[in-house]
Amino acid sequence: MITISEAAQAHFVKLLSDQPEGTHIRVFVISPGTAQAECGVSYCPPDAVEADDTEIEFNGFNAMVDEKSAPFLEEATIDFVTDQLGSQLTLKAPNAKMRKVSDDASLSERIEYVIQSEINPQLASHGGNIMLVEITEDGIAVLQFGGGCNGCSMVDVTLKDGIEKQLLDMFPGELSGVKDVTEHQHGEHSYQ
């Protein structure tokens, strides 16, 4: 479920040594499955352990995960990185905003998962996003751009060289292309 690097484990052991005996860490997701999902790590005293928590054993401590957060923390990683600017704990949870779909899910569900977990986070740096409108009978993913992508002068390059290439590589034989149905209006909201 959650991978914690050796450096992060050592960091947690050190932090927990200053806490009352029996204190664990809790890894959680606030608003899981939404665009506003946020992950966190906190102390978990013994009296805060719930009956439906999942307990994951590590060397020197245990991590608690509440039942609601658990499916959204699949494939999550925690690391402790040190560089010339200092040290930082990082938590990456690719499924926090949307639960990972199974390999036998419908094509639209699998594409929607890739959009939410991989493509939209990249577009968010420009204030943009895309939404899957439909998949046509001939395998065309019909997409609509929003936010900073609406009216951006680079939208065609983003669509063909970025999004289409990525989706066709991931869904060979199932998807034949992508189409933008956005009524682009360049304005202050547009990235370029």
From Swiss-Prot:
Cofactor note: Binds 1 [4Fe-4S] cluster per subunit. The cluster is presumably bound at the interface of two monomers.
Cofactor: [4Fe-4S] cluster
One GO molecular-function entry: iron ion binding
The keyword Iron-sulfur belongs to this UniProt entry's keyword annotation: yes
InterPro entries: Fe/S_biogenesis_protein_NfuA, FeS_biogenesis, FSCA_dom_sf, HesB-like_dom_sf, NIF_FeS_clus_asmbl_NifU_C
Binding site for [4Fe-4S] cluster: 149, 152
Gene3D superfamilies, sorted: Fe-S cluster assembly (FSCA), HesB-like domain
Keyword Iron included in the entry's annotation: yes
Pfam families with a match to the protein in the record: Fe-S_biosyn (PF01521), NifU (PF01106)
One Gene Ontology biological process: protein maturation
Keywords in alphabetical order: 4Fe-4S, Iron, Iron-sulfur, Metal-binding
Ranges in a coiled coil: none
Family assignment from sequence similarity: Belongs to the NfuA family.
Its job: Involved in iron-sulfur cluster biogenesis. Binds a 4Fe-4S cluster, can transfer this cluster to apoproteins, and thereby intervenes in the maturation of Fe/S proteins. Could also act as a scaffold/chaperone for damaged Fe/S proteins.
SUBUNIT field: Homodimer.
Official protein name in the record: Fe/S biogenesis protein NfuA
Organism of origin: Shewanella pealeana (strain ATCC 700345 / ANG-SQ1)
